[in-house]
């Protein structure tokens, strides 16, 4: 059955007893990296445009009633079966990303938004794009730094911006608890910290380099990313020669085709992780658990990945998943949906 009010309140009571970070600490670092144009008062913001995939999920969590549509996701079909009808009706509008934009400025203006919000990388490229878009359209643009460790602060600060502080506070509290549990696992000298390769793409030969947003969730548990390239922290293409040389003892993928290729292709069989059947597939959502996008969806992916190695996390996984969907996706999962979502490959 889904999560009823009594179960949810009981869970929150337990959650409130955890040694959470104080609010003053959470606000010590401003995760709103840039404000371009005159930002309206919170009570005046009713129509919000998401600039990209991480912002899609941030705004779905905080203010689905103000979100005009997704930049990148279409949940109207079978892929959106886990979500409410209201969420499934949100259109895919296209993303704002400079020359690669799929949402034109002309269409943007016809939507009459009060504000544009982006979340993720906040480097000079994205700041310049935000400033230019705001100047060209007259629509205020807010850029949020999207580091996973900073998710609670992102939620509180953008929640304040959108006048949804109560909802944001509950979400931030749960995010704090997930991150603290992951940090405790990482700092425990007795826990397993495998050397991992994060396989992307149909052939499994795309990956995120160590320190990138794309592998941040896995690295947060203290796992060692075998893919490194000096100071680069991006996605990259690799070869089988790279993988054979790195010889990871764990492979993680979110792509079913990649999983099939890795586990059945002869060239992968000499990789230690494959030989020892330590290839984890995390699929079942219309977006990734640990990446694609590198947004707050990674919190739940963190819970699920930790459950493979931590018996306590494994015991809490179903409860965590129900609570996450309730708080962030505004959906109460039934037992069948939960089992399907968490099926193990």
Predicted regions and their residues:
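C-terminal segment of N-terminal export signals and the immediately downstream linker at the start
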Residues: 2-3, 22-40, 48
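A short, structured surface patch at a secondary-structure boundary
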Residues: 55-110, 115-124, 226
């Amino acid at each position: 059955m889904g999560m009823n009010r009594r179960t949810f309140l009981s869970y929150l009571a337990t959650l409130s007893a955890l040694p959470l970070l104080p609010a003053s600490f959470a606000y010590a670092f401003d995760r709103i990296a840039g404000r371009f144009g005159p930002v309206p008062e919170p009570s005046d913001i009713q129509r919000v445009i998401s600039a990209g995939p991480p912002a899609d999920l941030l705004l779905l969590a905080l203010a689905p009633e103000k979100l005009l549509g997704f930049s990148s996701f279409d949940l109207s079909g079978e892929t959106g079966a886990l979500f409410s009808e209201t969420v499934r009706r949100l259109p895919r509008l296209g993303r704002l990303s400079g020359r690669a934009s799929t949402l034109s400025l002309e269409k943007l203006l016809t939507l009459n938004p009060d504000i544009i919000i982006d979340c993720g990388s906040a480097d000079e490229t994205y700041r310049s794009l935000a400033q230019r878009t705001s100047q060209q359209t007259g629509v205020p643009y807010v850029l949020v730094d999207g580091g996973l460790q900073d998710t609670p602060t992102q939620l509180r600060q953008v929640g304040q911006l959108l006048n949804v502080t109560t909802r944001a506070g509950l979400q931030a509290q749960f995010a704090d608890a997930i991150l603290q549990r992951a940090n405790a696992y990482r700092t425990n000298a007795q826990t397993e910290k495998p050397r991992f390769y994060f396989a992307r793409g149909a052939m499994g030969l795309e990956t995120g380099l160590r320190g990138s947003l794309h592998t941040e969730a896995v690295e947060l548990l203290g796992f060692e990313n075998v893919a490194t390239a000096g100071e680069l922290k991006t996605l990259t293409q690799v070869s089988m020669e790279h993988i054979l040389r790195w010889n990871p003892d764990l492979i993680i993928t979110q792509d079913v085709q990649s999983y099939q290729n890795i586990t059945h292709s002869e060239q992968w069989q000499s990789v230690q992780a494959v030989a020892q059947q330590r290839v984890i597939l995390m699929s079942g959502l219309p977006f990734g658990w640990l990446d694609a996008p590198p947004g707050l969806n990674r919190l739940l992916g963190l819970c699920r990945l930790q459950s493979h190695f931590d018996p306590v996390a494994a015991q809490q996984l179903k409860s965590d998943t129900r609570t996450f969907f309730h708080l962030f996706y505004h959906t109460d999962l039934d037992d069948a949906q939960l089992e399907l979502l968490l099926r193990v490959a």
